[in-house]
Amino acid sequence: MYLARDIELGIFRAVKELPIRNKREAGLFRLLNHPSLPQMIDYTERDEYCYIIMEYIQGKTLEQYLEEGYVFSIEEILHIGKVILQVFEYLHSRKPAIYYGDLKPSNLMMTEQKRLYMVDFGSAVFSYNASYKETKGTRGYAAPEQFQGTISAASDFYALGKTLERLCGRKKIPYLFQCPALGKFILKCCRSEQT
């Protein structure tokens, strides 16, 4: 990922460099328009690489916040969960549906204004490619079936449960007493029978 400056407009853009064989990410990303997803601005190919030029999100990943010792409040965790559910509703209701495939704190960016963005669509697939062998996800967040080479909406929800659990961190037990519905939701997301 590179940071570039648009000389004509005087604004920064993020530029993602990919091997040309991975250009399906650009084709999929080009179709998306949601307030919690970075906007794709342009696409170009050169030699063995393709470049996705997109909106620059100035902020940090949720993983960076965790590494810095930040403790998310229960309200922040519930808000993050709500935003992710809205993005999943948008992706899963498309025709054909899109499965994100790699939800985790390092793929979620938050601006200083607390606006959340889901980034990195490298593992996303259309539902008709649900047995796409390259979509493995990240250990600790990916649903068990992803390691068998299949993915579904339930796989995304499994990763959501694991992500929310990680955001609770050391406060997990007090948070689950404070908001039992959150605990039930996390358990429901991570039940292996649904995946």
Range-by-range predicted roles:
Residues 43:
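Activation-segment/catalytic-loop signature of the eukaryotic protein kinase fold
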Residues 132-145:
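Conserved activation segment of eukaryotic-like protein kinases, specifically the C-terminal portion
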Residues 2-20:
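ATP-binding glycine-rich loop module of kinase domains
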Residues 156:
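Conserved catalytic-loop aspartate of Hanks-type protein kinases
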Residues 80-81:
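Activation segment signature within eukaryotic-like protein kinase domains
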